[in-house]
Amino acid sequence: MVSPVVLATTAMIVVFLLAQRYLSLPVLPNEPLLIPHWMPFFGHAFRFARSKRSFFRWANAKTGGQPFSVPMGGRRHYIFSDPADIAGIHKNGKTLSIRGFVRFIYISIWGFKPADADAMWEIKPEWHRMDIEWLLSDKNDQIAVQYLRRIEEQLRALDAEVEGAPDKAIVRPGLKTVVDVQGKATCQVLYGATTLEKHPGLLDDLTIMVRDGFWGLLFRAPRFLFRNAYEARDRIINTYADLVENIETRKDVSQYLYERTVYLTQQGISPQAQGADMLRTMFASLLNSMPTGYLALLHILAEPGLADEVRKELIDCGYLERSPEEMLEILPGKMPLLRSIWHETLRMHNNSLTVREVTADTKFMGKTKWQVQKGGVINIPCGLMHFNEALHPDPESFHARRFMDKELGGEGESHARTTKPFGGGSTHCPGRVFAEKQMIGLVAALLMRYDMGIVNADWKMPLVSEFDDITKQPTVWIRISKRV
C-alpha cells in the first residue's frame, strides 16, 4: 500500500506542474529569453527580495548580458539594460506605462488614500511643470544658494562640537553626520526652519520609517508588524499637513513649496494628502543625495591623496573667496574632479529600478526588435548598465577620474548615456540638478573646513546607496578636526 505521505507529495507535485503549465504565458518570437522557475506564482520573487542587485547580476550572467524575463509574483518581468533598448522603451509610454507603479508606491510608501493618489495623478502635468521650473531651470539656483547658507549654519554647530572637545577633535558616525548636516539644511530650505523646530525629530522619523519598515510598507504588511515605521510615517505626514494648513504664516518656507501648496489646495487636495506628498518630495530630495554624499566622502577619504587633490581643485577655482551667491559660478561647473566622483559614486552604488507596466502587447525597436506581452512588467535596473564592462572598463573598481575629460587628466567616459541613476523618459527625475549641487556643496564644505579620517580599520564600503540598506550597515566612524 502506498504511503499517505507519498500520495500527498505526488499530488502536490502534480498540482505545481499543472499550475506551472496553465498559469504561464507562452514565449513569443522576439521576446526576451525566459529564465523559468519551478515555483508557480512566486517564481524568482524570494531570490529578488533577498538582494535585487545580486539577482539581476546572476540572471544577466546566465543570459550572457542579453535582455531576459523572469516569472515573479504572478507576472512576467522583462529586464533590459542596453542603452538602445532603454531608449526604445521610453518612446512607447502609452503602452509601457508607469501609471500603475506610481499609484502603488503613492499608496504603499507615501501613505496616500487611493482617491487622493488618483487625484494627484490627474493634475500631475501642472505640479510636475512646477517641479521642472524650480528644479531644472535657473530658478533652482535660488534654492541652492539658500542650501549653501544652511550648510554653513549646520557646520558652525559642528564647529562648536569640535571646539568643545578636549583635544579639539571628535569621532562621529559618518552617515549620521551627513544626515545631520545635509538633511537639516535641505529640510530648512524647502520646508522652513519652523517645520524642523516644531518637529525636531523629522529626520529621525524618516530614518525609522525607511530603515525599520520600507519593505513592510511597500507590501502593506499589517500595522502591528511594523508599528514603528507606520507611526514615524504618520508623524511626518501630520507635520507637513500642519505646514499646509498654516502655509500663509510660514514665511520661511521655500517659494517653490509655497506655490505648489497654493496650487494643490486650489485643486481640492486635502492637507493630509499634501502632507503625504511632501513626504514624497522629502524622500526624493534626501534619500538619493544623502547616501551618495556619504559614500562619495568615504571614497575620497579611503583613497590616499584624493582629499588633497579635491582641496587643490577647490582652491584653484576660487572656492575660498566666494560667498554662497558667488559659489554657483563655480559649483559644479569648475569642479570636474568632484563631478566625476559624484557620477562614479552613483555608478557604483545606485541601485534604482525603473519600472513600466505593459498595458497592451507591444513591439518596439531597441538594439533589436522586441515584443512584450500585456500584463508583464518591464524593469530597467541601472546597476546592470553601470557594471557593463563594455561601457565601463574595470567596473568593479572606483575610478575617481572616470568621468573627467581626457584633456583634464581623466578617462573621458560620458555619464549621460551610460548611467541612469535618475531614471529617464517622461519620469526623468527633475531634482537631479539640485542633487548634484547638494552633494558637491556638502562634500566641498566638509573637506575645506575639516581634516577627516576613517577611524575603524575593519570598515567596509557599503555596496548600495539605498537608504534602507545603508542604515543597517556597520557604522563607519570618522574623526573630525578643524583644518589649520
Curated annotation (Swiss-Prot):
Organism domain of life: Eukaryota
Cofactor list: heme
Binding site residues for heme: 429
SUPFAM superfamilies: Cytochrome P450
GO biological process: mycotoxin biosynthetic process
Gene Ontology cellular-component terms listed: membrane
Keywords, in A-Z order: Heme, Iron, Membrane, Metal-binding, Monooxygenase, Oxidoreductase, Transmembrane, Transmembrane helix
Induction record: Expression is positively regulated by the oxaleimides biosynthesis cluster-specific transcription factor poxB.
Stored Pfam families: p450 (PF00067)
Main location: membrane
Catalytic activity, EC: 1.-.-.-
Enzyme class name: oxidoreductase
An MF annotation (GO) of this entry: iron ion binding
Pathway(s) per entry: Secondary metabolite biosynthesis
Localization per Swiss-Prot or TrEMBL: Membrane
Segments traversing the membrane: 2-24
Bilayer disposition of the protein: Single-pass membrane protein
Function recorded in the entry: Cytochrome P450 monooxygenase; part of the gene cluster that mediates the biosynthesis of oxaleimides, ccytotoxic compounds containing an unusual disubstituted succinimide moiety. The first step of the pathway is provided by the HR-PKS poxF that serves in a new mode of collaborative biosynthesis with the PKS-NRPS poxE, by providing the olefin containing amino acid substrate via the synthesis of an ACP-bound dec-4-enoate.
Family listed: Belongs to the cytochrome P450 family.
Name recorded for this polypeptide: Cytochrome P450 monooxygenase poxD
Primary gene name: poxD
